[in-house]
Amino acid sequence: FFNVEAWINSELATEFAEQEEIAFTTGDGTKKPKGSLAYESTDETDKVRAFGKLQHIVSGDATAVTADAIIKLIYTLRKAHRTGAKFMMNNNSLFAIRLLKDSEGNYLWLPGLELGQPSSLAGYGIAENEQMPDIAADAKAIAFGNFKRGYTIVDRIGTRILRDPYTNKPFVGFYTTKRTGGMLVDSQAIKLLKIAVA
């Protein structure tokens, strides 16, 4: 016996998670949430930057991220926001970051050595998000911040599934809806690392 509805629920959960990741990262705000990377960014500091604009730090290299840029990104974020802060980047960027060393030859990336402990970069957790751009000239490849304070996600409870055995006989159709939203609520809580142009 194969439970079609359970399988559909599982597939829907996966698809909704992927679509939400896209929307919350790069969504343009038209019939979808405005993603964190869709907000304008500037190199202005928190003291002079207008609300709704994110601050970016420009890396010193057009093809790579340096250890100095990572440290600068961390300390551009105010102390109050560093509590609970994480890095966000895609898998390709994470691979490049894992090779970074400090001036004494120590890796900035540390594996989680205990069961259940996550890996860290310079003491902060890492969230993988495949919607973040690769490290390339002018890309905002890495975000660092307290995303819970900086970006709010609102979900209407539950996913609505309508089972329709009548419209397309002998087939059964499934119609699914889910309502969600997201927006930047504290532009000082998230910083971006923008790769240099040249």
Model-derived features with residue positions:
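Structured, hydrophobic secondary-structure cores that serve as assembly/anchoring elements
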Residues: 1-198
